[in-house]
Amino acid sequence: MNHFQLHQVITTPLPVKNDIEILVFKTNLTDTKRIGDIESLLDIHPHIIQWNVDLNDCDNVLRIVSRNVAAQEVENILLNAGYYCEELQ
């Protein structure tokens, strides 16, 4: 006679960060030409919902509304395009 023992496995789902967050960066995006240089890079990112640059701010602030985007990732995108970018705390 075969005896089978059933085991119930209880799993807890891994936490998924679905919260929308706003990231703010100091940049050297000082004019519309420079902003145009990075526009397509930010527009095609699947987790960046919205972004803008405040040219009237002394830090030329880049503001990104996103889901699951690390600040370092944004900094690298701009650095690879030849621009300065540092997260503001």
Model-derived regions, located:
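Short glycine-/aliphatic-rich beta-strand segments at the starts of folded cytosolic domains
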Residues: 12-29
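Short beta-strand-to-loop capping motifs
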Residues: 27-29, 63-68
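C-terminal structural segments of small proteins and small subunits
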Residues: 67-88
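Short amphipathic alpha-helix segments
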Residues: 28-46
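Short amphipathic beta-strand starts and helix->beta connectors
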Residues: 6-11, 43-50
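Conserved short beta-strand edge segments in small beta-sheet-based binding/regulatory domains
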Residues: 16, 52-53, 82-89
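Short Gly/Ser/Thr- and Asp/Glu-enriched loop/turn motifs at secondary-structure junctions
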Residues: 55-59
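Terminal low-complexity, intrinsically disordered regions
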Residues: 1-12, 17
